[in-house]
């Protein structure tokens, strides 16, 4: 749906970040076809060709769905990814879905230069949130 698209676009606009500046996304990524295909389509809509340059991970693959706590924990994962310049893996990634065609960092994390990252938290009925984070250079 358009909710995830609008949420990411509004976050980028509010933060004054161009889509091309983003390096990494911690996706809502529940590991279900419906959610993952919709979120992938939304990322393509927001980032265009740049979507293929992003690492898009699901830390839920490691923690499970923490319900009300998921967004906070995933924002921490995203801050740590920026600090450590390391994209965490999407573990248990075994059967690629043709509708999900981004770099999901399957099964093994990797070093990556990152300046800006997003963390998505998308919910049923349009309860969507997204936070933009920047690597601290201090």
Q: Where are each of the predicted segments found?
A:
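Conserved "HGTGT" condensation-loop signature of ketosynthase/thiolase-family condensing enzymes
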Residues: 1-138
């Amino acid at each position: 749906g358009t909710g995830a698209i609008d949420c990411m676009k509004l976050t980028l606009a509010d933060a004054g970040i161009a889509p091309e500046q983003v390096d990494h996304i911690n996706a809502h990524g529940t590991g279900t076809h419906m959610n993952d295909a919709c979120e992938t389509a939304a990322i393509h809509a927001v980032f265009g060709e740049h979507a293929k340059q992003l690492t898009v991970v699901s830390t839920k693959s490691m923690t499970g769905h923490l319900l009300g706590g998921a967004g906070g924990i995933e924002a921490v994962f995203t801050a740590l990814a920026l600090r450590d310049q390391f994209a965490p893996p999407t573990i248990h990634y075994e059967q690629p879905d043709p509708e999900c065609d981004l770099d999901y960092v399957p099964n093994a994390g990797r070093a990556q230069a990152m300046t800006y990252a997003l963390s998505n938290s998308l919910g049923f009925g349009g309860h969507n949130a997204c936070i933009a984070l920047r690597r601290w250079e201090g």
